[in-house]
Amino acid sequence: MKSVALHNLGCKVNSYEIEVMQQMLQEKGYTIVPFDEIADIYIVNTCTVTYIAARKSRQMLHRAKQKNPAALVVAVGCYVQTGREDVEQDPCIDLAIGNNRKKDLASILEEYLRDLEQEDAVAENAENAGHGVDKTLHDTTVIDINHTAEYEEMTLKQTAEHTRAYIKIQDGCNQFCSYCVIPYARGRVRSRRAEDIIREITGMAKNGYREIVLTGIHISSYGIDFDEEAWKRGESVSVLKEDEERRDYSGSSKLIDLLERIHDIEGIERIRIGSLEPRIVTEETAARMAELPKLCPHFHLSLQSGCDATLRRMNRKYTSEEYAESVALLRKVFDHPAITTDVIVGFPGETEEEFTQTKEFLDRIQFFEMHIFKYSKRAGTRAAVMSHQVPDPVKTTRSGELLAMEKEQSKRFRAHYLGREAEVLLEEIKELDGVEYLLGHTRDYVKVAVPLAENGEKAVTNTVVRGTVEGFVNDEILLLSPLEFSK
């Protein structure tokens, strides 16, 4: 059977999808090899969220063809969906598969290889034998993602991680932030049936996974495309209509309904949720989440800017004060929750005054972690044609200021644990400065280390350890003195 090398770029949704694709190929008998080795087929699951991500996608595709010019190079995902013309003209790409067709990867590959064999048989002595199949993109491999209401059902049985499994619960986004190309790459909101999610998580629990993370493109919109009456009957039936595509669905309680069902699954001890819109955090949803002991107090609330004028240009549908209220609600019902966020610097029109407002707001909120991004112009978005584009050197300076602020806030949050007890799910063994440690995370996702030499007999991966935090191993990792281990 042919050998296949896979490479993934981008978000946790992409990571989930490439693991499913690898699983499907293995079930079909393909041999999986590392991407830096010679393979018959190279598959790159691409990303296009920023210019750099798209460039890296192209680089990996070109690297594959350079590694083995005779190999079949397959581009999959978001870059294919948004860069159709570039993909068609790229001589390094033999086959392109868009989003919502990843579940059909194996069958598409088999059909392509059959066509290739027939072409080679006809042109056995011809100069162009070997890659004569027309790769022009068409609806069989790249669908019109903007006009599909069908969720692409895939199920993951195992994952590369030993303790934590990412579970995809929805795809697509209806928000159309002015800087973002993702709605065009992923299409409108399409939610996964709750029954399929529960079945997959139950299977993961039986396979020994103790922690799951719900992920998606815009998980705050989970369930907004379901028929209300069917949902009340316990059914997940999608009824998305063309004229409803751009409605604002944030604040849906169906995500909380789903969390409550997952909470009842035996064997799952920790539940995490991916990036949330701040508007989904209301008094009701916060109170309901607080009633779920398995739900980890770690919330990623996407901010992007602390300046209201910038938020309006971004088409973010909240104010900085509304964001602050959402954080306050979470801190009211959870004890010292970890709040993380994303911030974009150098958005078109961002003045020094607006940037100062953002800094002041970040200082006011105090985050556990902040992901700082320099604005990246994406073709086809409204922000790409806005006036007053910010020069790159200014973006770099502002990014540096926020990264320094992030480092201070993050260490301050971790320092809260000093002298306190913590519960850690151990995940891996790693050497740090010549010493071997077992590493894991607290419920609020602070990384903690346990010395392996002193506790090797008791401490193994996928074990829960409780103990007292004694200090820092480094700026990002706390040192735990174990008191109790439990399977």
Model-derived regions: residue spans:
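Terminal RNA-binding accessory module
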Residues: A126-A129, V385-K487
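Proteins enriched for Cys/Gly/acidic motifs involved in redox and nucleic-acid/cofactor modification
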Residues: M1-Y222, E229, S236, K254, ...
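Hydrophobic, well-ordered secondary-structure elements that form the walls
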Residues: L301, D342, L362, M370, ...
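Short flexible coil/turn linkers enriched for glycine and charged/polar residues
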Residues: A160-T163, C173-N174, L295, S305, ...
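Aromatic/acidic polysaccharide-binding cleft in carbohydrate-active enzymes
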Residues: K374-H388
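Contiguous mid-protein beta-loop-alpha structural module that forms a pocket-lining wall or clamp
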Residues: E350, R364-F367
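Conserved SAM/AdoMet-binding glycine-rich loop
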Residues: V73-V74, T82, K206-E352
